[in-house]
Amino acid sequence: MKEELHAIRDEAIASVEEAKDMKSLQDLKVKYLGKKGSLTSVLRGMGKLSKEERPVIGEIANQVREQITAALDQKTEKMEEEALNEKLEKETIDVTLPGNPVHIGGKHLLTRVVEEIEDLFIGMGYEVKEGPEVETDYFNFEALNLPKNHPARDMQDTFFITNELLLRTQTSPVQARTMQAYNGEKPIKMICPGKVYRRDTDDATHSHQFRQIEGLVIDKDITLSDLKGTLDIFAKKMFGEDREIRLRPSFFPFTEPSVEMDVSCKVCSGQGCSVCKQTGWIEILGGGMVHPRVLEMSGYDPKVYSGFAFGMGQERIAMLKYGVNDIRHFYTNDIRFLTQFHQA
């Protein structure tokens, strides 16, 4: 039996060395070490041995099993290493090849402009307020001194959802909501950026959806000079320290007196050109002193409090600052346009 065990060992190790693939190794393992394998079959005959022979043959059998197992493990490891090397050779990466370009995105121009405006006014002590885009008729019109059937309502071409709900035509409702929430009990210094909607036909200067940012200050002894000073700071920070402003009389139901603000043309420095239509000035926003009736409806005593308000289109500010001639460029997602304004 001793010779038979050694013969099985030699045959098994030789077969393992000649194996060509993992399946062959698995078959050899079953052939020699399995429940019906050669080694197991020989060991079943140990019952016929004497007590003295059994320990000796048992030890030899264990050694043979360990030697066959070791041969199988070594061959398996060798095959796995060869397979890995072959795979790596096929998947070799040429590190000298140029990499794929990484396209770095940037903030949209409108986002940059509104953040710049917000930072400017936050630096002057303003809070940023927000409100719903689906607004009530009351806050969009009536609370702003635009009662039902007021002719100025027609100027805003409103998207109505129901008789009392609409898509806001301006961000002024946020001001009205804030004033009524404060109920005349404390001063206000706020700006409110956001989307607004009007039934305009889209063209180079109009859009059915655009963005506004409006400001409101209410306190004691606020005058038109405070508004002018604030807008002068805004114009110089946004368009350059050499820019000048002028205020022209206008009409807005929310304010009295009302003004429109022009800034000196950046292209011609106020001398007159095609951009400013030879006037030397470009209109950028409207504003005025908060109407006493609006103050009263919001709980503020107009004999004690006064305030100013202003509003501007973010797209218009961006167009003037960066020389964009068509508002539609902001919304078509043309990468050729957008990449012109990526910051380094």
Swiss-Prot record:
Belongs to the class-II aminoacyl-tRNA synthetase family. Phe-tRNA synthetase alpha subunit type 1 subfamily. One of its GO terms (cellular component) is cytoplasm. It comes from the Bacteria. Mg(2+) binds at residue 256. Keywords: Aminoacyl-tRNA synthetase, ATP-binding, Cytoplasm, Ligase, Magnesium, Metal-binding, Nucleotide-binding, Protein biosynthesis. This is Phenylalanine--tRNA ligase alpha subunit. HAMAP family: Phe_tRNA_synth_alpha1. Binds 2 magnesium ions per tetramer. One of its GO terms (molecular function) is transferase activity. It is an enzyme of class 6 (ligase). Tetramer of two alpha and two beta subunits. One of its GO terms (biological process) is phenylalanyl-tRNA aminoacylation. InterPro entries: aa-tRNA-synth_II, aa-tRNA-synth_II/BPL/LPL, Phe-tRNA-synth_IIc_asu, Phe-tRNA_ligase_II_N, Phe_tRNA_ligase_alpha1_bac, Phenylalanyl-tRNA_Synthase, tRNA-bd_arm. Its EC number is 6.1.1.20. Pfam families: Phe_tRNA-synt_N, tRNA-synt_2d. NCBIfam families: pheS. It is found in: Cytoplasm. It comes from Oceanobacillus iheyensis (strain DSM 14371 / CIP 107618 / JCM 11309 / KCTC 3954 / HTE831). Its cofactor is Mg(2+).
